[in-house]
Amino acid sequence: MELEVRDFTTEINILDSEKFSVSDEIFKCPFNQALIHQVISTYLTNSRQGTRSQKSRSEVSGSNKKPWRQKGTGRARSGSVKSPIWRSGGVTFAAKPKLYAQKINKKMYRGAIRSILSKLVCDNRLFLVRNLFIKEPKTKLLLEKLRTITSKKSILIFTDFLDKNLLLASRNVHKIEVRTATHIDPVSLINFNVTLIADNVIKKIEKQLV
């Protein structure tokens, strides 16, 4: 299949843009919602640190002596200052460090990314861009260039390398992120409304996802 290539350095009209041949195996796959859900759930689970730790009543520092006698004081009975119902007491069912990591094979992971990319192409939310750089690290300049391609404000940009000017210009803009083609992941692809890919890295992405 062929995709239009936009030029980042000029305000070129879509009708005048060039065509770029891309792999049908990567950008024309059927949408597999079940696979995408499974891969994203695993990806998010693996990003959990699992380091939270709370103290149970047996671990809290304090005396084990009964605060007052069982009967005769008129107060509610109590057996320990470390009771979970007391202030500064232990936690009931205290959380402990836990490993949340799950495994998912490469074939499924790549398949999910191919499915997402194909859906983006189908929805006209993925664009190939030539000369994806700016001459000065100016946010205003970057936004002007992006407006010639899309009116959306949530944009994910993939380049061959992290251009310093592009990175600095996008750093203080909410929902605009610049990455290299080697850092493509399913969660980012669905979190942004539009994805821009430099035309010189499209073959590298195809090679990763075959």
UniProtKB/Swiss-Prot annotation:
Renumbered residue ranges of the record's region Disordered: 47-83
UniProt GO BP: translation
GO molecular function: rRNA binding; structural constituent of ribosome
Keyword terms: Ribonucleoprotein, Ribosomal protein, RNA-binding, rRNA-binding
Polar residues bias spans: 47-64
GO cellular component: ribonucleoprotein complex; ribosome
Coiled-coil intervals, chain numbering: none
Entry-linked InterPro entries: Ribosomal_uL4, Ribosomal_uL4-like, Ribosomal_uL4_dom_sf
HAMAP family the UniProt entry points to: Ribosomal_uL4_B (MF_01328_B)
Function: One of the primary rRNA binding proteins, this protein initially binds near the 5'-end of the 23S rRNA. It is important during the early stages of 50S assembly. It makes multiple contacts with different domains of the 23S rRNA in the assembled 50S subunit and ribosome.
Subunit text: Part of the 50S ribosomal subunit.
NCBIfam families noted in UniProt: rplD_bact
Family in the record: Belongs to the universal ribosomal protein uL4 family.
Name the record gives this protein: Large ribosomal subunit protein uL4
Organism, scientific name: Blochmanniella pennsylvanica (strain BPEN)
